[in-house]
Amino acid sequence: MKRKLSWMCAAVIGLSAFPAFMTAAAPATPPLINAEPTEPAPSPATEAPVVAQTAPSREVKLTFAQIAPPPGSMALRGVNPNGGIEFGMRSDEVASKAVLNLEYTPSPSLLPVQSQLKVYLNDELMGVLPVTKEQLGKKTLAQVPINPLFITDFNRVRLEFVGHYRDVCENPASSTLWLDIGRNSALDLTYNMLAVNNDLSHFPVPFFDPRDNRPVTLPIVFADMPDLAQQQAASIVASWFGSRAGWRGQRFPVLYNHLPDRNAIVFATNDRRPDFLRDHPAVNAPVIEMMSHPDNPYVKLLVVFGRDDKDLLQAAKGIAQGNILFRGSSVVVNDVKPLLARKPYDAPNWVRTDRPVTFGELKTYEEQLQSSGLEPAPINVSLNLPPDLYLLRSNGIDMDLNYRYTSPPTKDSSRLDISLNNQFLQAFSLNSTQETNRLLLRLPVLQGLLDGKTDVSIPALKLGAMNQLRFDFRYMNPMPGGSVDNCITFQPVPNHVVIGDDSTIDFSKYYHFIAMPDLRAFANAGFPFSRMADLSDTLAVMPKTPTEAQMETLLNTVGAIGGQTGFPAINLTITDDSAQIADKDADLLIISAIPGKLKDDKRIDLLVQATQSWVKTPMRQTAFPSIMPDEADRAADAQSTVTASGPMAAVVGFQSPFNDQRSVIALLADSPRGYQLLNDAVNDSGKRAAMFGSVAVIRESGVHSLRVGDIYYVGHLPWFERLWYALANHPVLLAVLAALSVVLLAWVLWRLLRILSRRRLDPDHE
């Protein structure tokens, strides 16, 4: 893991890729341009790892569609000439070759040669692409060799457009100054693996490397079919790695007594261990050991040892909660003692709902709340909220905004625009004197996950589980220009804007109440299981003899929930005895098959059994997840039973028959290929977005959801809020009750006035 000695091996491979400068263009075929590389000399103090000649290598193609800001293409302009991409390099790898393949189209109005595209890596100039006469207005292909000596753990490739459309008196804001970078542009990299020491002080590297932007794939190995305690230990570890993976995604393939050809986690006890550990000495305590793969020294295994299953659980909790103390090739987990009980809705990845939250707490990187440039880039703040936050009657969300900015050059010409989930919210002028740089706002919102109605509140700004608050500082910048005889020239100065870390937003005044079943809340936020971040209110129901695919489904699911909450499932309960589910006050997560006690429940709208399946369909199906049909449209119209040989999986949600405040989520599949489809859907954000309602059917064609059957409610509302909620979706009844209330109030006032009038006219009358 340490990078020592010299960069010579990587340098020889990297420099051999640098071709000579060429320019050629044909009208019919996009030209391929090879940039003349600039060769900045690396610092003599630079250290590089020793790469063995036999070290494995891998080739990576990072397209702009994957790693550039959406939509992947870039429009470089005169006033906004910079664009770029970011990528990381694992600490157990070194780059030996890198080539940037660009696809771009320059404006036909540019002056050839004077206009250029400069390519930087970590602020070191890598190459220059002059715009030639033949390229103007045409798609151009170019290759820029990247010196691998300058590739570090975290890297930025910056593209700088230098554009000119005339020799004198240019206007940088001219619409003719542009160069578009295509989303098919790509960075081609060759990585060589490094030999890594068995040292846990770097944990979780190499099993999870935060510099690696790819989804985490971490196989879990058992000696044979795991019992319940081993399933629980593996779930704790998987959910912890999921909490670290976060937005990357995660997958945990399960293997019985078989080692993969990549980094993996292995569970073993003295009595039950994989064959490759047969000669390993017995342990007398919970032990976590890092060792090399027996067939590949570049692959590492994290072995969780124990005398018995109890030791495995303790070791798993040590990984989840005590890994900061790890060092050496192995550690003994002596004890893991809980000190404070978790509270509902305290997931680290969720915005706190018990007090106002500062924007500093919401930052994910240091410079997130500031921006610079003639046109500063938008400042974005993510708000991950519990999906059951009840906002139906909310007057708005209080936000105390503190911001600083460069004074606008002209008065009443610049403004701050605030948007929520791509919907415009409010605008404020940027004063040149900065007399007002603090705002007390109330963000008007509409509940997005409760009932989807849009006739209750105006404006209809939807607030869901995942939200994006955006601040756009828009400056009216004076630009040089004029004519050749009367030219106005000056150097435009970039603007700087900052949202203060002490700005706050307050979600502490709201109840928790949601209409269920709602598979969208499960797919986006792991709800209802994520209500307790440690899954202490969750009971997972597994088959008595789980297959590798069924175990993978369990680990992928708890890993995904860990990624959404940011906390491991240290208190998850797992059972394979359906008789226990009736006695447990918990939400049920069912893997593989619905227990016999529940199969005849009328609340179930779909069942998958081997090659046969049946489903209930509603009277009328809505096309969009955000539209909540009324009770008549949701009613089951028909039940169809089908026998087929093709694979299918499903996610089904319904109310628990044992507790009306608890829910059941069942993950079902009919075959090994069905489980593969199910796991792909759980790990694919696009397919998860297609899940809503009470039933999600997963086939080779994709995910199709239904909203069918009765709705039930989870959470608590005061009686007056309950009354309003019941009437909010029945405007006629609300109008009738309002009219009756007015008549009753008028009659009471009339009677009071009559009594007062009699007393005034006849004081002796009682």
Swiss-Prot record:
This is Cyclic di-GMP-binding protein. It is a single-pass type I membrane protein. Tightly associated with the cellulose synthase catalytic subunit. Keywords: c-di-GMP, Cell inner membrane, Cell membrane, Cellulose biosynthesis, Membrane, Signal, Transmembrane, Transmembrane helix. Residues 751-766 are cytoplasmic. The keyword tRNA processing does not apply. Pathway: Glycan metabolism; bacterial cellulose biosynthesis. Binds the cellulose synthase activator, bis-(3'-5') cyclic diguanylic acid (c-di-GMP). GO terms for cellular component: plasma membrane. InterPro entries: Cell_synth_B, Cell_synthase_bac. It is found in: Cell inner membrane. One of its GO terms (biological process) is cellulose biosynthetic process. The keyword Cell membrane applies. Residues 29-729 are periplasmic. Belongs to the AcsB/BcsB family.
